[in-house]
């Protein structure tokens, strides 16, 4: 079982799949055992409840759904899950190491 679970949410859950791969690679290179996955924003309620996938230790929104931050932040707070929006530059450049570091900062 993974030490930490990092969930990413975007419009369809597909555009973040490459970023997830890069984050997994960065985690492995640093000896971290994280489960990292991406889903659609439609799955946020289930993710925060741990239904259908492990409850995340942190939730990151893709920049294309940043407008949802206020709504999601309320739900995440109730669930006890820190969340934030991925920086557009890191997302656009697919900087898995930077996004992983941001997730780790939120978990600490």
From Swiss-Prot:
GO terms for molecular function: kinase activity; protein-N(PI)-phosphohistidine-sugar phosphotransferase activity. It comes from the Bacteria. The modification Phosphocysteine is found at residue 10. The keyword Acetylation does not apply. The active site is at 10 (phosphocysteine intermediate). SUPFAM superfamilies: PTS system IIB component-like. The keyword Acetylation does not apply. PROSITE patterns: PTS_EIIB_TYPE_3. One of its GO terms (biological process) is phosphoenolpyruvate-dependent sugar phosphotransferase system. InterPro entries: PTS_EIIB-like_sf, PTS_EIIB_2/3, PTS_EIIB_3, PTS_sugar-specific_EIIB. It is an enzyme of class 2 (transferase). Its EC number is 2.7.1.204. Keywords: Kinase, Phosphoprotein, Phosphotransferase system, Sugar transport, Transferase, Transport. Induction: Induced by growth on galactose. Residues 3-108 form the PTS EIIB type-3 domain. The PTS EIIB type-3 domain is phosphorylated by phospho-EIIA on a cysteinyl residue. Then, it transfers the phosphoryl group to the sugar substrate concomitantly with the sugar uptake processed by the PTS EIIC type-3 domain. PANTHER family: PTS SYSTEM N,N'-DIACETYLCHITOBIOSE-SPECIFIC EIIB COMPONENT. The phosphoenolpyruvate-dependent sugar phosphotransferase system (sugar PTS), a major carbohydrate active transport system, catalyzes the phosphorylation of incoming sugar substrates concomitantly with their translocation across the cell membrane. Involved in galactose transport with PtcA and Lmg_0963. This is PTS system galactose-specific EIIB component. It comes from Lactococcus lactis subsp. cremoris (strain MG1363).
